[in-house]
Amino acid sequence: MTKYNFLCIDIGTTSLKAALVSETGQVLSFLKIYFNSKNIRTLSFEWMNAVKTALSKLNNESKEKVKIDAISISGNGPTIVTEDGQTFLSNEKIKIKKSIQKKIAPSLFLPRIFYFKNKFPESFKNKKIFSGPEYLIWKLTNNHITILPEDRYKAAYWSDEKIKSINLEPSQFGAYINTGAIAGTLDKVIAKELSLPEVPVVAGGPDFTVAIIGTNTLEVGKMCDCAGSSEGINLCTNIPVYKKGLRTLPSVIPGLWNVASLLQSSGRKFVECKIRRERKVGQKLTYEQYIAHCAKNPNSSGY
């Protein structure tokens, strides 16, 4: 038995991923819970049930009750969730006036929040505002926080002045804490529902940041491919690179940067190819089976 076990939860656009990871980084168990809701606006209502389902399945797969010492929460960003659960996914398109865009630049979040607020004004009146992982952390701990990957990211988030410029109040936003910090302790009632002790809940943050940390792309010259519904080829560098087609963001390591080439639809295209193959063979395929098929057939659409 390992000394410490960590439940790592990541919220995607279509599923919740859960992994039990040891203190040495060994993945002891992994599973994916797909969301059922066809209404993307209420998708956040499924997240807690997905956590319960994941824990139940992890325990069923184990010969003994799973021991969990802490929980880490990450998720896609910038998905926005209001206190009443209205959800605006990170891949949804927005359209706002250039004058507004200029006023709140370079924030990656405020343009989406402004657009969402105008669509659902009642959900924003004196109510808390979260990203996806922060909303689940709030549900688990009752703590309202904002996860900041590194101090240089503040401009990409918000300031009090910019929040007020779109007629919202700074009090609606959680206080900044850094990735890896303890966001709180599992609420007593929630702990009982999940059949867990009141363990620490750790701020994982945006899935992009967690993927960079998890693959140890934290030294100059290291590279990783982060793929989901979209994809990014990421390079760690000590020099920021600004060029069309590349996105440069601070690394979680002070003084370093992450340069990415983004492929916005590669994951969706892969799924479309998989579906076509399933129709052809008349049965559902796991991703492992489809990848094996592609690797054996250079002429296949998914090669």
Give the location of each predicted region.
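Gly/Ser/Thr-rich active-site cleft segment
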Residues: 11-13, 103-206
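Structured N-terminal alpha/beta-domain signature
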Residues: 18, 38-39, 43, 51-52, ...
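N-terminal glycine/serine-rich phosphate-binding loop of ATP-dependent small-molecule kinases
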Residues: 1-87, 123-126, 192-203
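Conserved ATP-utilizing enzyme core subdomain
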Residues: 17, 141-144, 283-303
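Short glycine/serine- and small hydrophobic-enriched flexible loop segments
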Residues: 56, 114-118, 271-278
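Glycine-rich phosphate-binding loop of actin/hexokinase-like ATP-binding domains
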Residues: 80-102, 126, 130-131, 141-160, ...
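Short glycine-enriched loops at secondary-structure junctions
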Residues: 24, 77, 134-135, 182, ...
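Glycine-rich beta-strand-to-loop/alpha-helix junction loops that act as flexible
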Residues: 74-77, 179-180, 227-229
